[in-house]
Amino acid sequence: GDVLSALPFDLYGDPAEPGLVCAPFLTAPASGPNVSVFDNGLPLDRTDWLRGGRLEHLTYHRAGAARSGATPTAPVDNLVLDLPGAGGTVDDLVARTERGLLLTCLWYIREVDPATLLLTGLTRDGVYVIEDGRIVGATNNFRFNESPVDVLARATEAGGTVRALGREFGEWVNRTAMPPLRVPDFNMSSVSQAS
């Protein structure tokens, strides 16, 4: 697969992941673009979506896999992003930042371009200014336009992976573990009045 990041990130789902255990078989209440109710019961093992920064798998329901000559690959009901060997916390990343913004929450995320995975959304509940390794104040919320593929490609540092709950899709994607990331040139397109 294509190399998506210079950093050797692993992105995977694993039904046996400690603290994020989920069903070891597919349970689809309705058919969608990546799963079919006809796939219910499909056994799920660890699936590496990225390994070492390189694309490993895409989702395929049984019918799509048959058409493509691929193996059916259903999404596991958890998601882990990890940079092997990385450690440290958000505070550690802040301490090593000369000047930047600390984003604590992204929400109202919508797809703009499915071909590039371009998303738009808003920051919320805390955008902090960092100078010389310290948080020196808060600033406005912003609208952003970014592709998660581009974010991983530009990431220059990651902390240790910790359990996280996404604000936007937390009721659907509630088993995740992610590291804090340093991402130069994150695209803030405009100031938002959201608070």
Where do the model's predicted regions map?
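Dual-mode signal for accessory low-complexity, basic/Gly-rich regions
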Residues: 2-195
